[in-house]
Amino acid sequence: MVRTRELRRGFGDRTVLRGIDLDIARGEFVALLGRSGSGKSTLLRALAELDDAGTGSGELRVPSERAVVFQDSRLLPWARVLDNVILGLSGADAAARGRAALAEVGLAGRERAWPRELSGGEQQRVALARSLVREPELLLADEPFGALDALTRIRMHALLQDLCARHKPAVLLVTHDVDEAVLLADRVLVLQDGRLATDLRIELPRPRRHSAPEFIHARELLLAALGVDLAAPEEEKQAS
């Protein structure tokens, strides 16, 4: 599904990705952690083929059917919700597919709404609908819940898990939140200085509980891999 070997990317004289070997199977949910500047978004953009491949080298195989969700929903403000979802879709059933996707994310009846009439969480639901209506084989998500409040994040986590279980795309989620990574992912990667330093499989049943000893253990392993002092205050224990 996704395969990279010795993938390298850089900007000018600066090398950002230093030989990434990565495999993601269909239906597998992978989370990517790393400190700011470690190359997380660069790797995601490479997998989305949104970057200039001329700035790098290595093997890159990704499916042609892929979708990207960003922290900013990137909805067109002058287009209604349904029109945002089906933008670029062809076929007589495009509108019906768009309505079905909106129903999947809990926004049935909001097809005629303008983006400005939606909350931040609702806008991200539209962004998910826009991605999944295309039935992507690969879903790339770059901190999609970073700007949402805590309660909305919890709801969006549950929604994303449900949608991925139904549609079974390969998923790469870029996040700064270690708990989010352990909660959602089958595997968690840590990117450090442009290299994959950690690849941790999360062997926990779903739904996962933050209080479970196995959850806490995985969290501590990842925080240590990120170089976080486990004795530090709670607010410092994130992939800054």
UniProtKB/Swiss-Prot annotation:
Localization in the cell: Cell membrane
Pfam family, one: ABC_tran
GO cellular component, one term: plasma membrane
Broad class of where this protein is predominantly found: membrane
Amino acids binding ATP: 34-41
One function term, GO molecular function aspect: ATP hydrolysis activity
Domain ABC transporter residue range list: 2-218
Annotated membrane topology: Peripheral membrane protein
Swiss-Prot/TrEMBL keywords: ATP-binding, Cell membrane, Membrane, Nucleotide-binding, Translocase, Transport
Enzyme Commission numbers on file: 7.6.2.14
UniProt-listed InterPro entries: AAA+_ATPase (IPR003593), ABC_transporter-like_ATP-bd (IPR003439), ABC_transporter-like_CS (IPR017871), ABC_transporter_ATP-bind (IPR050166), P-loop_NTPase (IPR027417)
Membrane-crossing residue ranges in chain numbering: none
Catalytic activity: ATP + H2O + aliphatic sulfonate-[sulfonate-binding protein]Side 1 = ADP + phosphate + aliphatic sulfonateSide 2 + [sulfonate-binding protein]Side 1
Function: Part of the ABC transporter complex SsuABC involved in aliphatic sulfonates import. Responsible for energy coupling to the transport system.
Quaternary structure and interacting proteins, as annotated: The complex is composed of two ATP-binding proteins (SsuB), two transmembrane proteins (SsuC) and a solute-binding protein (SsuA).
Family designation: Belongs to the ABC transporter superfamily. Aliphatic sulfonates importer (TC 3.A.1.17.2) family.
Protein name according to UniProt: Aliphatic sulfonates import ATP-binding protein SsuB 2
Native source organism of the sequence: Nocardia farcinica (strain IFM 10152)
